[in-house]
């Protein structure tokens, strides 16, 4: 979260302290919705334990297209680019989800206070958005092919 060799970024000690000192924990029961389609992100979520399942709009296992594992995070590009969720974020079915969170407003404040960090996090968030949209489109294509096969039979 605080350094990236690919981008040549290492967050300064002061930024890390400000970031970490504002984290708080949230625990979700298995299968709970975290962020629904069309909602704003109130916070940045870092998964400490458990998984988060990402689904397209609609209900059912066919709509699930990606799983965020322990130690990953989400909400960054939605907050930094003021975007509403285009997918459903839900805790995994088998165990509790424990996240560490940073309020939306605090993340934006940190980005204003630390311009170097803002440049890095916005660039990385944009790349994460592109990758997630690529996976979503790939899943939609797979669903469309599956539906075409069903309709022919």
Regions found by a protein language model. Give the residues of each.
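Eukaryotic low-complexity, acidic/Ser/Thr/Pro-rich regulatory regions of large signaling scaffolds
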Residues: 62, 76-131, 135
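Regulatory nucleotide-sensing modules
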Residues: 1-94, 105-106
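Cyclic nucleotide-binding regulatory module and flanking cytosolic helices
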Residues: 1-33, 111-150
């Amino acid at each position: 979260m605080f350094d990236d060799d690919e981008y040549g970024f290492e967050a300064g000690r002061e930024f890390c302290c400000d970031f970490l000192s504002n984290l708080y924990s949230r625990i979700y029961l298995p299968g709970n919705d975290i962020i629904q389609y069309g909602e704003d992100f109130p916070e940045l979520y870092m998964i400490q334990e458990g998984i988060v399942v990402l689904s397209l709009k609609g209900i059912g296992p066919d709509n699930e297209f990606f799983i965020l594992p322990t130690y990953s995070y989400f909400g960054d590009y939605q907050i930094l680019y003021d975007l509403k969720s285009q997918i459903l974020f839900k805790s995994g079915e088998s165990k509790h989800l424990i996240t560490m969170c940073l309020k939306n407003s605090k993340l934006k404040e940190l980005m204003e206070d630390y311009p170097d960090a803002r440049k890095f996090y916005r660039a990385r968030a944009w790349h994460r958005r592109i990758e997630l949209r690529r996976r979503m489109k790939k899943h939609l294509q797979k669903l469309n092919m599956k539906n075409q096969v069903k309709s022919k039979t």
